[in-house]
């Protein structure tokens, strides 16, 4: 049996770090769905300047895209593009890319490809994992934190962008994620909400680990 853990939540809530540490604890494969969207955004931005996301040319290009994943790295044409996915430009562009239904379907297909490669367990983090990608997940988690706390965390990771700009970006992204037509950020049915404002990463991981053990035992 392949166990599945879905971790959803807004930008900066600690999904990626939590999933990475859980992977080390459980020995499961992890998928960062946000990185896949960022990879699509990066390839589109670097291949087509000012791409018309509604054009047939772009749709056909996206449908042929393929990526591979190795731990936390994303490979495109056998090149590791992970270091290019966290720029301010991609931060802004990915929210537009993620709104398009055909791109969401493509990312879903890629996620399913990665899921099939796992024979023990899978941890997927994103914004619509418990609702659309893994509705049958063994455990569904929704990580949350206040915008100010999330902005502080992001600023510590990327001090090249001011705290004020980081906070404004998070508030804007929250609105976009929660109001988009397809794959909106919501708490999945049956998900356990964990507010991480006053919790360390280790405390969050311990809590999810205990919840998972209770589920499977």
Swiss-Prot record:
**Gene Ontology MF: a single term:** CMP kinase activity
- Answer whether the UniProt record assigns the keyword Nucleotide-binding to this protein: yes
Q: What SUPFAM superfamilies is this protein classified in? A: P-loop containing nucleoside triphosphate hydrolases
Coiled coil ranges: none
Residues holding ATP: 9-17
Q: Which superkingdom, per the lineage?
A: Eukaryota
The kind of enzyme this is, by top-level EC class, is: transferase
What's the EC number here? 2.7.4.25
- Write down the chemical reaction(s) this protein catalyses: CMP + ATP = CDP + ADP; dCMP + ATP = dCDP + ADP
Gene3D superfamilies in the record: P-loop containing nucleotide triphosphate hydrolases
The entry's keywords: ATP-binding, Kinase, Nucleotide-binding, Transferase
Which InterPro entries does the entry mention?
Cytidylate_kin, Cytidylate_kinase_dom, P-loop_NTPase
- Where are its TM segments located? none
Keyword Chaperone listed: no
**NCBIfam families from the xrefs?**
cmk
Q: In which family does this protein belong, per the annotation?
A: Belongs to the cytidylate kinase family. Type 1 subfamily.
* Name listed for the protein in its UniProt record: Probable cytidylate kinase
Q: Which organism is it from?
A: Vairimorpha ceranae (strain BRL01) (Microsporidian parasite)
């Amino acid at each position: 049996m392949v166990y599945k853990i879905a971790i959803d939540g807004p930008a900066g809530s600690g999904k990626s770090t939590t999933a990475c540490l859980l992977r080390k604890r459980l020995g499961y494969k992890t998928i960062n769905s946000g990185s896949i969207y960022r990879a699509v955004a990066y390839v589109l931005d670097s291949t087509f300047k000012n791409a018309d996301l509604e054009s047939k040319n772009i749709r056909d290009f996206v449908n042929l895209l393929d990526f591979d994943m190795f731990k936390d790295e994303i490979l495109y044409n056998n090149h590791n593009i992970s270091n290019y996915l966290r720029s301010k430009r991609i931060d802004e562009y990915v929210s537009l890319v993620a709104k398009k239904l055909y791109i969401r379907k493509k990312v879903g297909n890629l996620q399913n490809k990665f899921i099939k490669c796992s024979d023990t367990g899978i941890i997927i983090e994103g914004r619509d994992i418990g609702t659309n990608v893994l509705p049958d997940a063994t455990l569904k988690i929704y990580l949350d934190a206040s915008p100010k706390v999330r902005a502080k965390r992001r600023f510590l990771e990327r001090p090249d962008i001011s705290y004020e700009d980081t906070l404004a970006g998070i508030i804007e992204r929250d609105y976009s994620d929660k109001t988009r037509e397809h794959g909106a950020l919501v708490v999945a049915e049956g998900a356990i909400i964990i507010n991480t404002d006053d919790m360390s990463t280790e405390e969050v991981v311990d809590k999810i680990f205990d919840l998972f053990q209770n589920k499977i035992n």
